[in-house]
Amino acid sequence: ITRRLSKRADQLSIQAKTLSQQNVIASKLSNLSLQLYSHLLQNGYVKNNEELEFINKYFYNKLPKYEFDSFGFREKLWLYKSHLWFSFLCQDIVNSYKYARKWVDLFKENKKYITLHPVFYLKGINYLLEASFFVQKRSIFKRELASFEEEIEQKIIPLNTNTELLIFEYLYANKLHLHFL
């Protein structure tokens, strides 16, 4: 009995250390994402090479070292969000699309998180549509917008005051974007 408890204590200690490391990575990525978003709000998009160099250095200096294979849902989400904001800041719309796509696919591969974090899911869909619009990919945009409408009709996204407002805003803004594609 004593050996079993000792082994169990060791297992719990290892699990606690792993969880702690995941929390540190998630926190660093979350902070990086928020700092990039804040920079975008305060300064706008990169306008010249000097600003591009600053953002590149800032991003890569703040991006923590990680092993992607050890990531769970949360760490992947914050990684994709960080790369998305970095790409948007640099006006790299192709990479913005790439990371918005990864963000949305992460939710679609882990459907329970759509219910747990519907606002993040909706924001990911909106960024995916926005990036599709900017790269002028009409067929992709139409497909993603139709998929969004289908999810709304099938009530896949939980409804509350916040999600209803976001759905309304994102759906009709993107229907307007479709008109201009």
Residue ranges with predicted function:
Residues 1-54, 69-70:
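Flexible inter-repeat linkers and adjacent short helices
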Residues 2-3, 31-48, 77-92, 122-135, ...:
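Tandem amphipathic alpha-helical repeat scaffolds
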Residues 3-14, 44-63, 90-107, 135-155, ...:
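Helix-turn-helix repeat elements of alpha-solenoid scaffolds
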Residues 6, 49, 53, 70-74, ...:
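Alpha-solenoid helical-repeat scaffolds
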Residues 19-26, 62-73, 107-118, 152-164:
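Flexible helix-coil transition and linker loops at the boundaries of alpha-helical arrays
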Residues 23, 31, 43, 48-49, ...:
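Detector for Asparagine
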Residues 56-86:
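C-terminal intrinsically disordered extensions
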Residues 76, 101-103, 120, 128, ...:
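N-terminal capping/interface segment
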